[in-house]
Amino acid sequence: MPSTAASQLVAAKGGSFLVENRTPTEVFTPEDLSEEQRQMAATVAQFARDEILPAAEEIEEKKPGVLAALMRKAAELGFASVDIPEEYGGLGMDKTTSTLITDHLSVLASFSTAFGAHIGIATLPLVWYGSEEQKQRYLPKLASGEWLGAYGLSEASSGSDAMNIRTRATLSADGTTYTLNGEKMWITNCGIAGLYTVFAKIDGEKFSAFLIERDTPGLTVGAEEHKLGIRGSSTCPLVLQDCKVPAGNLLGEPGKGHHIAFNVLNVGRFKLGVACIGGARHALAHTIEYAKQRKAFGKAIAEFGLIQRKIAQGATQLYAAESMAYRTVGMIDASLEQLGDHASRSSREIQKCIEEYAVECSILKVYGSEMLTVVADELIATMGGYGYVEEYPAERFYRDARINRIFEGTNEINRLIITGWLMKRALSGDLPLLGAIKTLMDEVTQPPSLDGSVDMGEALARESELLAALKKIALFAAGVASQRFMAALQEQQEVMADLADIITQVFALESALLRARKLGRSGKHSAKVAADMTGLLADESVAMAEQAAKRVLAACGEGDMLRTQLAILRRLARFTPADSVGLSRAVARECIQAGKYPLQ
């Protein structure tokens, strides 16, 4: 369990970061890991170094058996068992440990994609919704790696629109067998899996899930796809032609498959964001290593300011993503702690604790995947022509990064989820967002005054002040959009996406700031670089939010009203910038000296 006392950590409501303030002791950070968790992280990292990276070329070339054997080896070490209860062959550990495994295994996207699918979307539906007989039969095999898992939801005509699947299931007259017909597309692990969780509509109407073994009559695995990235992972179509599935292999209740599909996606999105953090950390180390070795104009290019800016930008965004990820899993574990010990927790209760943080999961997915894209792109920029050559890892990082903005719901869909989910909770009264918006709207129509919400004598006071302003920008933009469009706001996708980006910057900056303040109180050397990265992030977050808010306001009004609203926005977003050149150089120096991400 986390070393920070459970009584200090707060299981805050999902999305409450917009309307509530937290203290550093109330949030979990990577520095709070217990000794047991650190040992697990070290074991996983060693496996990644000693087993995954040496096999990278063979995995990418799809050498038969290599990927599956390595996944089974990881499972033998317990990496596939953390989220599976002990009574079914698992370890039943906390979600922070599960997060660490995903984080530190993610040095090769082909492997992390395959293993992540196995331990996540292919296993958790069974853990949460399986009958006792189903769990006893399948979970020990999945935990040990004897069988690998795959998850079949997407179809050629229904990607993001998951409820529009065409695969049909028909129950036999005697009620013993379902016959499935349809085709699933882009199924990760399809070619190596022993068990498939497949979604179909019973009688063309009831959206349901089924557990299908590989040797089931009527199930055919199609040819491997030749992909832009994650080339070493198995991705195939799954064809169901009069596929006979025992009625006992229906997962959950008939017509309730959407609960399974959507709830497991929350974990999938969170874990994908975490995997992007691990991948970015590895890519940033390559950037730093090359920059230190490459000489130009008589010195290492790591000494040049523009290269240092690239390194600092990558480290700063990585720091923000990492802070969000461990803060989120800390809230999940704090919520689970309230349920009592592992044995007393029902699968439904665990699922509800995770579902509470659906918006944070979507935020991390979007931010993490786009952060990795930046880091991979700057690795190629740093390496120049070498970055385009397959002999070097940069081009693989670049190719592999793109899929993360598509997986687990595209980033466009997740942006709509972020804003839509918060508005839904606001309207239901689960989140006091509407009251906060009203208070802010009343405030901004009055002459400006100091609200006293920030103690300017505290550490990182400037960044705290910018965070307060950022929250006001988010509430102001959301309030204007809500008044303009009301219930029709969901139809304004561009506005929804811009609001999501502002909200994301709030969560990113607050998570980074709280972590930096917590480190500052510890007296550790790393506190300085954390503070510098938070300073860089604060300026960038407010600037990005202001631009997004301008687009929202312009879509909502015109003339004098728009000019008045823009004046209010300028007042909210007004700040004295930090010396970003100096901060970037300071952050880059720490990275270059460490030869890697400085908080690693």
Located regions from the model:
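Amphipathic, small/basic residue-rich leader segments at the start of a protein or domain
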Residues: 1-116, 133-144, 333, 337-351, ...
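Glycine-rich phosphate/cofactor-binding loops in nucleotide/flavin-utilizing enzymes
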Residues: 2-26, 100, 375, 385-460, ...
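Glycine-rich beta->alpha junctions and the first turn(s) of the following alpha-helix
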Residues: 3-4, 30-33, 39-40, 220-322, ...
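C-terminal helix-coil-helix/basic helical segment that borders enzyme active sites and/or dimer interfaces
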Residues: 56-61, 319-367, 380-381, 486, ...
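N-terminal glycine-rich flavin-associated loop
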Residues: 114-133, 159-162, 171-174
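A short, Trp-centered hydrophobic/proline-enriched beta-strand micro-motif
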Residues: 145-153
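A short core secondary-structure module
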Residues: 176-221
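C-terminal amphipathic alpha-helical interaction region
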Residues: 445-453, 458-600
